[in-house]
Design a protein with these regions (language model features):
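N-terminal loops that bind phosphate or other acidic moieties
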Residues: 1-132
Length: 132
């Protein structure tokens, strides 16, 4: 079973744009869910929406959550507390840049990596430089 990814952002447009990029990567097809923005289209995050996104992917091969900003991380941590323990044990919150981490995670998941390796791939992008 493939590892799924949940994209947590304060902006639905930002998260949906990232999902579009990820779905366009060669060999993609990784299960993706978005938990972004407020219920009326405003900026924000919701622990309830994040928990729902995780549950929509199911336990499968595990789930990695990537968040755009610090308060998104706090919402994700709250969401984890709300999950059934049997699911929570298979869900991991990545300490990674939102875009670069998501790209690395999708590539690893598409290659068949397990949830620990997908998480490690995302977190390995923390020090990636864009310029020499």
């Amino acid at each position: 079973m493939s590892v799924g990814l949940v994209l947590v952002s304060h902006s639905r447009d930002l998260a949906e744009g990232l999902r579009e990029v990820l779905e366009g990567l060669p060999g993609a097809g990784v299960p993706l869910a978005v938990a972004a923005g407020g219920p009326d289209g405003e900026l924000g995050t919701s622990a309830l929406a994040i928990a729902g996104a995780v549950e929509s992917l199911g336990a499968g091969g595990g789930v990695v959550i990537l968040a755009d900003l610090g308060s998104g991380v706090l919402s994700a941590e709250t969401a984890l507390e709300q999950l059934d323990p049997s699911l929570r044990d298979r869900v991991h919150l990545a300490d990674a840049p939102f875009v670069e981490g998501a790209v690395a995670a999708v590539r690893a998941a598409a290659a068949g990596a397990d949830v620990s390796a997908v998480l490690a791939a995302a977190e390995a992008t923390r020090g990636v430089r864009k310029l020499g």
